[in-house]
Amino acid sequence: MMALGRAFAIVFCLIQAVSGESGNAQDGDLEDADADDHSFWCHSQLEVDGSQHLLTCAFNDSDINTANLEFQICGALLRVKCLTLNKLQDIYFIKTSEFLLIGSSNICVKLGQKNLTCKNMAINTIVKAEAPSDLKVVYRKEANDFLVTFNAPHLKKKYLKKVKHDVAYRPARGESNWTHVSLFHTRTTIPQRKLRPKAMYEIKVRSIPHNDYFKGFWSEWSPSSTFETPEPKNQGGWDPVLPSVTILSLFSVFLLVILAHVLWKKRIKPVVWPSLPDHKKTLEQLCKKPKTSLNVSFNPESFLDCQIHEVKGVEARDEVESFLPNDLPAQPEELETQGHRAAVHSANRSPETSVSPPETVRRESPLRCLARNLSTCNAPPLLSSRSPDYRDGDRNRPPVYQDLLPNSGNTNVPVPVPQPLPFQSGILIPVSQRQPISTSSVLNQEEAYVTMSSFYQNK
């Protein structure tokens, strides 16, 4: 009986000891929980399952005992005040459509009814993009590059559509540095010249929100994909491109040398090296030389090449044509009377006016045409007298106008004389050929000349 009592006493003591140890353990857990660092992080993913959003939280220290800890979010919710996150190992999450996506929420770590730590976060600023998928790399032989394509889940989303992608690739062996390419589309190209020939490469891609309202973090890397670069072309062989370029270059240089040699004097040299003009020749071209042989004579023969229009002669001709009934030549008796009057008029003039200038003859000719007939207008001008210095010794000299006199033996034969300048329409036009004049005109000229000679002899 004593043995049975001892046994009950031992069992009771053991029960008390076990119960005391268990109570002390719970109190110790509370003390340890208060002393640990409960810092955490959270991120959201929008429209992961239709209109439902996902919120995920976890502690920064993975060694924390999370047996009695829980996460709770309050504020910026649609129909509820607070929501408690579900636990999956060391991760806390909740999938719901109650997020307002406007304003900030209060996320707290709780142990029982006690809040250990809290953070104020906005769901739209902690968005984590979804990882791209279906990454493919295709080699294009014609373009000599690699085409990289992948799928981004955000293209079909309602809220988050604009994201930035980061494509990273590196050789699969022997190198740890990644080459990054940033883009906003789901396809890109990698030129073959940037890759090593006949090498295996690893490539992967990730995304991050790129929006003014929705901001957040990089997504997880997509599953890696590998591709191999081809061998270099014509390795160890003959490249026909370089010789072709060399031959074309030499031929072009040879052609340029020939053209330069042919066109040097006519085209190239005047442009590259212009010649200076001679100043003497330039001055000769600019300055006109004065004429040395100026014709200042009043001789009618000097104006044979010129057409002289006399206004008075034209007026006199018009008056003659209006007064004369016909253009019949004058009778011989009238011609003799005219010659006699001309001789008497010449004898009565003073010796000082020895020669009748052409202007006097031209001025008197229209008057004679008016007084008598047009035939008298064609008579050549004669010397009215000789020079005042005329001497007796000069009498034996032949007269100046000897050609005007007929031969002494035959006075009735026409004598060729220089054709005078006929008066026609006020223009002096020379007659190139000598024509025989009428006998009456020759007699008048001879009579006038003999009369003047007798006048000088008497004087």
UniProtKB/Swiss-Prot annotation:
List the ranges whose topology is Extracellular: 21-239
Q: Name one Pfam family in it.
A: FN3_7
Q: Which segments cross the bilayer?
A: 240-264
Motif Box 1 motif mapped to chain? 272-280
Q: What is its main location?
A: membrane
Query: What are the protein's UniProt keywords?
Result: Disulfide bond, Glycoprotein, Membrane, Phosphoprotein, Receptor, Signal, Transmembrane, Transmembrane helix, Ubl conjugation
Residues bearing Phosphothreonine are T282
- Which cysteines pair up through disulfides? They are C42-C57, C74-C82, C108-C118
Q: Which Gene3D superfamilies match?
A: 2.60.40.1870, Immunoglobulins
Which cell locations does it reside in?
Answer: Membrane
Q: In which tissues is it expressed?
A: Spleen, thymus and fetal liver.
Q: Where do glycans attach?
A: N60, N115, N177
Q: Where is this motif: WSXWS motif?
A: 218-222
Q: Where is the composition biased (Basic and acidic residues)?
A: 388-397
Q: Name one GO molecular function term.
A: interleukin-7 receptor activity
> Which GO BP terms sit in this record?
B cell homeostasis; B cell proliferation; cell morphogenesis; cellular homeostasis; defense response to Gram-positive bacterium; gene expression; lymph node development; negative regulation of T cell apoptotic process
Record note on modification:
N-glycosylated IL-7Ralpha binds IL7 300-fold more tightly than the unglycosylated form.
Q: Does the keyword Signal apply?
A: yes
Q: How does it assemble?
A: The IL7 receptor is a heterodimer of IL7R and IL2RG. The TSLP receptor is a heterodimer of CRLF2 and IL7R. Interacts with CD53.
Q: What family does this chain come from, according to its entry? A: Belongs to the type I cytokine receptor family. Type 4 subfamily.
What is the official name of this protein in its record?
Answer: Interleukin-7 receptor subunit alpha
Species assigned in the record? Mus musculus (Mouse)
* Gene of this entry: Il7r
